[in-house]
From Swiss-Prot:
Function description: Catalyzes the transfer of the phosphoribosyl group of 5-phosphorylribose-1-pyrophosphate (PRPP) to anthranilate to yield N-(5'-phosphoribosyl)-anthranilate (PRA).
Binding, Mg(2+) 1: 96, 230
Residues the record lists as binding anthranilate 2: 170
Name the UniProt record assigns to this protein: Anthranilate phosphoribosyltransferase
GO biological process, one term: L-tryptophan biosynthetic process
Any one Gene Ontology molecular-function term assigned to this protein's record: magnesium ion binding
EC number of this enzyme: 2.4.2.18
Top EC group: transferase
UniProt organism field: Stenotrophomonas maltophilia (strain K279a)
GO cellular component, one term: cytosol
Amino acid sequence: MSFSPQEALHRTIEHGEIFFDEMVDLMRQIMRGDVSPMMTAAILTGLRVKKETVDEIAAAATVMREFARPVPVADTSNLVDIVGTGGDGSHTFNISTCAMFVAAAAGARVAKHGNRSVSSKSGSADALEALGAVIELQPDQVAAAIDRTGIGFMFAPIHHPSMKVVAPVRREMGVRTIFNILGPLTNPASAPSVLMGVFHPDLVGIQARVLRELGTERAMVVWGRDNMDEISLGAGTLVGELRDGKVREYEIHPEDFGIAMSASRNLRVDGPEQSIQMLRAVLDNEPGPALDIVALNAGAALYVAGVASDIGDGLARARAAIANGSARQRLQQYVETTRALVA
């Protein structure tokens, strides 16, 4: 007998936990469109108010992965996702998108999962499109891009078509729900390592433990104390690191890596064009906080991907990839490859 939406709603109202198998059953019903929009909204609200547990999030992510269109990557060694939940309200340029090119040029392979802007001035899809890349690639084309360039961008609407069932509900609700934290957990290429930024400090430990439940090998979940879903230059950054099946929580600071502190306002942009200008300046090795934050985040990605021995080593590799022009070349190679794949 399936777990009824009514029971789920009652459980959340009473601040009770929905167990893993129950949540799997419930999410399948929601993703199939078997639960009414009104009931779906009520359940999502109940989960948000009581705060989602590790098991609830892991179960929901498991079902989203079931319903996704997977990317057939034959070799996932050194494959990493650099992703953020968004919603931090910082309106910075596309740091993780820029870090993707740097990390790939420095030896990692990146399978980035993203979408258009929801809360920021420029989402990863918006930035890549402005750079001239084709973002609406099919799963086999993304796999080919990874094989040829070490980079693949998975545009969420193509890989998660079943999300259209809940899209109207989410849009009408207009508040964060569990779906805001599921996207970064549902990489269609099954990247074994992840650098994930989150919008709230409570999610640092939670998301790291969810990733462990989902079988991720290595991960860093980060939240900057200046409310950035990146490793920040403006304050300390809380880290939940998953390694060898254990989650360790700690804090890092830019000074730990010889980087001067800089307020996030120095990285803010008004839209995709300004974001692209800043991204290109970084890849042209223009000194400043934009280059520093990209190199630091790319360095962390290289660490979790197993390319670097620690973040400091990753930072050095990232800076070298920017300075020698290979990161800029990787951007151009990626843009040309995506165009060729659809020609």
